[in-house]
Amino acid sequence: MKILEFNDKRGSLKLHVENEDDLWLLHIIIKKGDRIVAKTTRDISMGKDSRRIPMTIELQVEYTEFQNFTTRLRIHGLILDAPERFGIKGAHHTVNLDIGDEVIIIKEQWSNYELEKIREQEEKKGKLLIALVDVDEYIIALLMKQGVKILAEKSLQTPGKDNDVVNENIEEMANEIISFVKLTGVNVIIIAGPGPFKDMVNQKIKQIDNKLIVYVDSVSSASRAGLNELLRRDIIDQVYREFEIAQQLKILESIMENLAKNTGLVVYGIEDIKKANELGAVDKLLITEDYLTDTGREIIDELLRDIEKKKGKIMIVPKDSPIYYQVKNLTGIVSLLRFRIN
């Protein structure tokens, strides 16, 4: 997601949609009564015939529809503004928002929580290290929201039949990757390359630091061409998505462990979480996407805003998440506490 323009006085935010996760977040954030401005098409009668005409309209939102693993968000509502010659003001219409589209969202008041989630989504494309490796060369790059920055590019001695050279090259590449991990502060790496050599480098990295999250993929060469090949694939979005799921899974594991030990450091259900938040006790909170959309929006928005003000971490669990049903069984909203409140 890319923020193109924000007008605080008007309450308008212009965005460029870059991936499916952006659409899902907009499904959560766009509420009934909000307004959007977007390009669309509509059937217009032309005498006996009708034609589908492209136009830009302003829509007052009634509801949104999003189906997981699609690339489209359907926004239903009433047309507030459109070209006069078509005479469609006040009519019902559905805007189909897709990857690559731009949209302006207008709200009476943007919550800090909503703006923070959008900024987080924009910043996601910023902390990913990519290392392409082969037996005698490597290239290391940092993927940022501004683009790709090459950090290192080097040719090494060709091993031939000398295993010592192979091991030396593996050692150098692994240490170089680890040094850039520390320098950039990333915690997710993609290692790619032709053949099995990439797996050997991955094993060496795991020996040095087994806490790093490493994804392995194949490309035709450890070069800039190979880097472009990797960037054209879906693995980048997949890595970000899986990393967020892994974070949520760790929180849930801690929640379940504390529940089993009866430590008093877990609360679930809206009322108990409200009480915990009043005391500043909410540390990490998991909330299912349908709980977020089905519950009274003003109540839940106010609660989430206050939790974030008090430095609590909130993670929204989508329906396709492997932990969705476990969180759903805990009422759909569950929190790990900083301290006992009973």
UniProtKB/Swiss-Prot annotation:
Primary localization class, coarse: cytoplasm
Keyword Hydrolase carried by entry: yes
Cofactor dependence: a divalent metal cation
One GO CC term, this protein: cytoplasm
Keywords: Cytoplasm, Endonuclease, Hydrolase, Metal-binding, Nuclease
SMART domains attached to this UniProt entry: eRF1_1
Cellular location(s): Cytoplasm
Superkingdom assignment: Archaea
Cited Pfam families: eRF1_1 (PF03463), eRF1_3 (PF03465)
E.C. code: 3.1.-.-
SUPFAM superfamilies cross-referenced by the UniProt entry: Dom34/Pelota N-terminal domain-like, L30e-like, Translational machinery components
HAMAP family the UniProt entry points to: PelO
Self-association state and partner proteins as the record states: Monomer.
Function according to Swiss-Prot or TrEMBL: May function in recognizing stalled ribosomes, interact with stem-loop structures in stalled mRNA molecules, and effect endonucleolytic cleavage of the mRNA. May play a role in the release non-functional ribosomes and degradation of damaged mRNAs. Has endoribonuclease activity.
Record family assignment: Belongs to the eukaryotic release factor 1 family. Pelota subfamily.
Record protein name field: Protein pelota homolog
Organism of provenance: Sulfolobus acidocaldarius (strain ATCC 33909 / DSM 639 / JCM 8929 / NBRC 15157 / NCIMB 11770)
